[in-house]
């Protein structure tokens, strides 16, 4: 009888430890899925030249957008334009305008997408290539910082490299 009560105690302790972990895993998985949906909406909006949808994915009252040349690209630019800057600021609004007005088909393809989140903030990191008129005109790495707002997950900042 003592063995059975000890076994019951061990099982009860195990279940009490596993249940909260599974609930936390489920919440984390739901956040990752929601962020992945933002990634997919971003890609679809570019292809569709849909500036309204694309703009809705960003935190509206905040803007941090940086482009950084990779070494080879930087060396080429510096040779032609000695006063050029390696790191350049822009805005998500300018990107939305570009997407809406591009006369050619455009697409950004993502590879090796990695998402991390604690449910309040998140990050997305991936390799990409950007196509214009069916031809690659940029490739590199990109990262997004994301925040969970009253309206769901939003991109709060973006950093990407420019390469060939």
Positions of PLM-derived features:
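Short beta-strand edge/turn micro-motifs at domain boundaries
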Residues: 123-125, 137-164
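Short, low-complexity N-terminal intrinsically disordered segments enriched in polar/charged residues
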Residues: 19-60
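Bacterial N-terminal signal peptides
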Residues: 7-17
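Surface-exposed, charged secondary-structure patches
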Residues: 78-136
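A mature extracytoplasmic/lumenal domain signature
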Residues: 58-59, 69-70, 126-130, 159-160
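Short, solvent-exposed secondary-structure junction/capping segments
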Residues: 43-44, 56-76
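Positively charged n-region of N-terminal signal peptides that target proteins for export
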Residues: 1-6
């Amino acid at each position: 009888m003592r063995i059975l009560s000890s076994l019951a105690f061990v099982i009860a302790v195990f279940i009490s430890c596993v249940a909260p972990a599974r609930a936390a895993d489920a919440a984390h998985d739901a956040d990752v899925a929601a962020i992945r949906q933002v990634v997919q909406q971003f890609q679809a909006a570019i292809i569709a030249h849909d500036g309204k949808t694309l703009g809705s994915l960003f935190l509206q009252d905040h803007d941090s957008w940086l482009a950084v040349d990779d070494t080879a690209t930087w060396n080429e630019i510096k040779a032609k334009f000695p006063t050029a800057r390696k790191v350049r600021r822009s805005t998500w609004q300018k990107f939305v305008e570009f997407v809406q007005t591009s006369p050619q088909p455009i697409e950004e393809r993502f590879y090796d997408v990695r998402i991390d989140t604690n449910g309040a903030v998140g990050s997305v990191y991936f390799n990409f290539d950007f196509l214009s008129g069916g031809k690659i005109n940029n490739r590199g790495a990109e990262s997004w910082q994301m925040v969970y707002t009253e309206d769901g997950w939003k991109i709060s900042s973006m950093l990407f490299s420019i390469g060939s």
